[in-house]
Regions:
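Short linear sequence motif anchored by a di-proline
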Residues: 9-10, 82, 96, 108, ...
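DNA target-recognition domains and sequence-specific DNA-contacting regions of bacterial/archaeal
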Residues: 32-149
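Short leucine-rich amphipathic alpha-helical surface patches
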Residues: 127-131, 149-156, 172, 176
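Non-catalytic DNA-recognition/assembly elements of restriction-modification systems
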Residues: 1-42, 46-62, 156-187
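A generic structural motif
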Residues: 111-114, 154-158
Length: 187
């Protein structure tokens, strides 16, 4: 791959990707203060017709996809974080594509920043850090999800530093591409 460095330069130029400085301060925020939380919708196996729309269930694998269905319902969403509150609790996945959510999965959209892959993936990790608290006997239900605190970097106004989160995500992506390109070039 002779043009790998050109591709990395293009990635840097497109998103202004640079290594973000370490945030000065981190702070706890309630999930409910950061996100709008919306429910999925119950859809039984008997009501599912085979199709090409991903159906997101409470699993810890396959990016949450448990089936492929034909018809969307009111839970159809995209560019969203799907968080399990039943089944594999606290597991969560970013869904940049259109999909339908079961009633065991909540949909999270940022309240005060435009949803984007990099910020949502940053928040995914922050939410996953809380997984150890929850078990079958102590479920991650809707109320607990709303009041769960997550640790996020802050800006000068003591608000979540979404710019830092986005830049960090982009920078990590470029680092991984560089790692892959280096591996390919060694072969």
């Amino acid at each position: 791959m002779k043009n790998t460095s050109c591709l990395l330069v293009e990635l840097h130029n497109r998103g202004g990707v640079k290594q973000p400085a370490n945030p000065v301060k981190w702070k706890e925020f309630y999930v409910d203060d950061i996100f709008t939380i919306s429910p999925g919708k119950r859809l039984t196996k008997a009501d599912m017709d085979s199709g090409n729309i991903p159906f997101i269930g409470a699993t810890d694998s396959n990016n949450g996809i448990t089936n492929w269905i034909a018809t969307p319902n009111s839970s159809f969403d995209r560019n969203v974080l799907g968080v399990n509150y039943n089944g594999s609790v606290v597991e969560n996945f970013y869904h940049g594509y259109g999909c339908v959510f079961s009633d065991d999965v909540k949909r999270l959209h940022l309240k005060s920043y435009a949803d984007n892959k990099f910020v949502l993936l940053f928040c995914k990790v922050a939410i996953l850090q809380q997984k150890v608290k929850y078990t079958y006997g102590y479920k991650f239900n809707g109320q607990r999800m709303e009041r769960q605190k997550i640790l996020l970097p802050t800006d000068e106004q003591d608000s979540p530093d979404y710019t830092y989160m986005e830049q960090y995500g982009k920078w990590m992506m470029v680092q991984m591409y560089q790692y892959y390109f280096d591996y390919i070039n060694l072969r």
